[in-house]
Amino acid sequence: MTEVETIIKTVLKTGGYRLGSKSTLKSLRNGEAKAVIVASNCPEEVLEKIKSYDVKILVYNGTNMELGALCGKPFSVAAMAITEEI
C-alpha cells in the first residue's frame, strides 16, 4: 500500500475529507482543505484550479474510477480534499 493510499484509508475512517472536484474546490476557497489528493487522470482544468491554491497536492497513481472505488463509491472521484491535518 502506498503512502497516498494509507492517507486515504485513514481519512475515510475519521471523516476529514470532501469528495469530488466541486467539493474540493469549495473546501479550498473556504480555507478548509489542508491537502488535496488527485487521481492520475484528473482533468487538467481542475488540476490548474487546485494548483492556484497554496496547498499540498498528492497524486494517487490510479484513475478517477479506481480512486472512487478505493473510497467505497460507485462513481469516479477526480479529486478529494483532506480537511484535517495528516
From Swiss-Prot:
It holds the Pfam family Ribosomal_L7Ae. Keywords: Ribonucleoprotein, Ribosomal protein. GO terms for biological process: translation. GO terms for cellular component: cytosolic large ribosomal subunit. Gene3D superfamilies: 3.30.1330.30. The keyword Ribosomal protein applies. PROSITE patterns: RIBOSOMAL_L30E_1, RIBOSOMAL_L30E_2. GO terms for molecular function: RNA binding; structural constituent of ribosome. The keyword Ribosomal protein applies. Belongs to the eukaryotic ribosomal protein eL30 family. This is Large ribosomal subunit protein eL30. The gene is rpl30e.
